[in-house]
Amino acid sequence: MSEPTSRRPAYARLLDRAVRILAVRDHSEQELRRKLSAPVMGKNGPEEIDATADDYERVIAWCHEHHYLDDERFVMRFIASRSRKGYGPARICQELNQKGISRESTEKAMRECEIDWSEMAHEQAVRKYGEPLPSNFSEKVKVQRFLLYRGYLMDDIQQIWRNFAD
């Protein structure tokens, strides 16, 4: 039988928790740090892991070393996931920034991903408003507002009507 969690060293408990968190999906380093430092629900309510800052650093280093934690991989998968859900580049960049990813890493990944954002914007507009897209001004404004909210850039949105006019 395994020993009770309260007797295990803090480092081992943190490492176990980190691996379980990263087994579900990729996380950024900042997200993992936040989740590791949050209290855990135990049998008797919330439990704090009495770990030192060094324990946290060792766990993060171990996760990097064993390729459980990789911000570059996280960014690429996050971009793919959010774009499949219909979000545009501006919204995705903002969400990555909130997750602690640097602007440089985000911009590099956005350049490397092979997503045609104007085509994605067109697909979202057609899904919401149907084919053919509205051509009168007031309806175009509604489509533009919707796509801006979803995180598409104005150039990509305007490209929809340029291609439509051709």
Swiss-Prot record:
- Classification via Gene3D superfamilies: Winged helix-like DNA-binding domain superfamily/Winged helix DNA-binding domain
Primary residence: cytoplasm
Domain of life where this protein originates: Bacteria
Which cysteines pair up through disulfides? They are none
Q: Which GO terms describe its biological process?
A: regulation of DNA repair
Cellular location(s): Cytoplasm
> In the UniProt record, does the keyword Phosphoprotein occur?
no
Give the record's GO CC terms: cytoplasm
Keywords assigned: Cytoplasm
Q: Is Transferase among this UniProt entry's keywords?
A: no
* InterPro entries according to UniProt: RecX_HTH_1st (IPR053926), RecX_HTH_2nd (IPR053924), RecX_HTH_3rd (IPR053925), Regulatory_RecX (IPR003783), WH-like_DNA-bd_sf (IPR036388)
Q: What does this protein do?
A: Modulates RecA activity.
The entry sums up its family as follows: Belongs to the RecX family.
HAMAP family cross-referenced by the UniProt entry? RecX (MF_01114)
Q: What is this protein called?
A: Regulatory protein RecX
The organism of origin for this protein: Salmonella heidelberg (strain SL476)
